């Protein structure tokens, strides 16, 4: 008979591949006489809409799955330890952690235990016990199981603060190939239901005092990138459509980490495309807060993001006709197109110039990143800097693409090592035997020359 601690260890570990909230990845057990523990028992962090960081218990209800998705560590044919909570076990575990001040909420997902309806019924019962018997008022993020009855989606939406339905892969073709048990329509249907009921609930909350909220923190989704051949342009078009049609709060991107051997997937030794994931998040930010469109960021000729430039700088290099921008007269929308100017600094510029004309000194105090912005703006009609093309290119290159750390081989022996999110070209040269720092310098020089020619 498996005890609760064993179940927690298995089901917290099985939940770590879901990126809708983040974990540290540390697995240092507690010690007698010491305060605290960083054991990998499912404690992770998420950020609320107002910027607060909350600690969540991140677990699966069960990792016993009736589906056989090729990319999933919990797939039916994979030989691994299996466990399932009972609704009361999960509720008592959550409330126990909450009372000890370990967590502020719960992130709950599950493998498909038998059928989607059966899985959702068990998850709902666990949340009902938490809310109604223990009067738990903390944050709950629940994953909706595609294919479940709409009535069950409504029930879980009344108990959870946020819902999410994972879109899994960027195209229906990839979904059919790697996850034949899942259907695109079964994923999109609950997304549409959640969007409609969430909007309706907000109206009811205004009109009726006793109205019950439905997923008041909205919904999100997650997709795996790097396991299938879709371009970044395809992914951003999909993302833009999801935000527009389903009013999503977030789309999360998960760089594919090979965990199972399958001829349809990248080999087990393949490094996850972390830099590509980073570029997608940067582009996602541009869609949500900078008012870019997906088709502005990528073209048919260049359907993937530049590994050496962030998407905003890439757009600026492609559109010299837009610059320079006069900071004392430009609209907020125009300011947001300038590399080095973000939403907060753009708003501060608009407010500050009502009082006085702005120069470089004022922009620096406002928070503008002048290292990049100085090449794209004028202040009172004067260009801030007239750098050479090579100087401008050097200022725009993303240092993250050439990131190198130090790896300790022995007490006195340290060697440079390319970090996991360095550009693929750096990692390839290192794999061929070149020192990581030399590889980074070589790739940076080549990228600099290439960018200088484009400008």
Tell what function each PLM region has.
Residues 1-64, 369, 377, 385-455:
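Flexible, acidic/Gly-rich N-terminal and inter-domain linker regions that tether
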Residues 352-353:
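Residue-level signature of tetratricopeptide-repeat
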Residues 176, 188-195, 226-311:
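A structural motif corresponding to the C-terminal lobe/cap of the Radical SAM core domain
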Residues 361-365, 374:
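Short Lys/Arg-enriched helix C-cap and helix-to-coil transition segments
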Residues 264-336, 372-421, 454-455:
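Long, highly charged, low-complexity intrinsically disordered interaction regions
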């Amino acid at each position: 008979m498996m005890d609760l601690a064993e179940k927690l260890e298995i089901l917290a570990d099985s939940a770590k591949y879901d990126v809708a909230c983040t974990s540290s990845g540390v697995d240092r057990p507690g010690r007698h006489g010491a305060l605290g523990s960083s054991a990998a028992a499912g404690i992770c962090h998420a950020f609320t809409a107002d910027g607060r960081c909350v600690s969540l218990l991140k677990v699966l209800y069960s990792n016993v799955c009736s589906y056989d998705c090729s990319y999933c560590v919990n797939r039916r044919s994979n030989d691994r330890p299996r466990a399932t909570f009972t609704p009361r076990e999960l509720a008592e575990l959550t409330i126990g952690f909450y009372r000890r001040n370990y967590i502020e909420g719960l992130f709950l997902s599950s493998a498909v235990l038998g059928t989607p309806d059966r899985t959702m019924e068990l998850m709902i019962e666990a949340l009902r016990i938490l809310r109604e018997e223990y009067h738990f008022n903390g944050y709950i993020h629940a994953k909706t199981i595609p294919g479940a009855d709409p009535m069950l989606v409504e029930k879980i939406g009344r108990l959870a603060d946020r819902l999410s339905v994972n879109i899994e892969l960027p195209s229906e073709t990839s979904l059919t190939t790697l996850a034949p048990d899942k259907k695109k329509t079964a994923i999109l249907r609950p997304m549409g239901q959640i969007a409609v009921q969430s909007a309706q609930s907000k109206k009811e909350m205004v009109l009726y005092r006793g109205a019950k909220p439905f997923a008041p923190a909205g919904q999100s989704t997650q997709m795996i990138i790097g396991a299938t051949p879709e371009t970044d342009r395809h992914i951003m078009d999909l993302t833009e459509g999801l935000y527009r049609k389903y009013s999503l709060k977030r789309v999360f991107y998960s760089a594919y980490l090979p965990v199972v051997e399958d001829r349809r997937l990248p080999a087990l030794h393949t490094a996850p495309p972390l830099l590509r994931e980073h570029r997608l998040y940067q582009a996602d930010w541009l869609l949500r807060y900078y008012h870019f469109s997906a088709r502005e960021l990528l073209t048919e000729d260049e359907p993937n993001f530049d590994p050496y430039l962030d998407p905003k700088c890439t757009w600026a290099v492609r559109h010299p006709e837009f610059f320079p921008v006069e900071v004392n007269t430009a609209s907020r929308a125009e300011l947001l197109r300038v590399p080095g100017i973000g939403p907060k600094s753009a708003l501060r510029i608009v407010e500050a110039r009502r009082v006085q004309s702005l120069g470089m000194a004022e922009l620096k105090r406002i928070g503008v990143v002048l290292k990049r912005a100085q090449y794209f703006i004028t202040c009172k009609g004067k260009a801030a800097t007239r750098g050479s093309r090579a100087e401008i290119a050097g200022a725009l290159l993303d240092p993250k693409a050439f990131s190198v750390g130090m790896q300790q081989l022995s007490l006195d022996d340290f060697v440079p090592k390319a970090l996991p999110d360095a550009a693929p070209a750096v990692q390839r040269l290192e794999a061929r035997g070149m020192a990581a720092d030399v590889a980074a310098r070589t790739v940076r020089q080549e990228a600099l020359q290439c960018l200088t020619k484009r400008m």
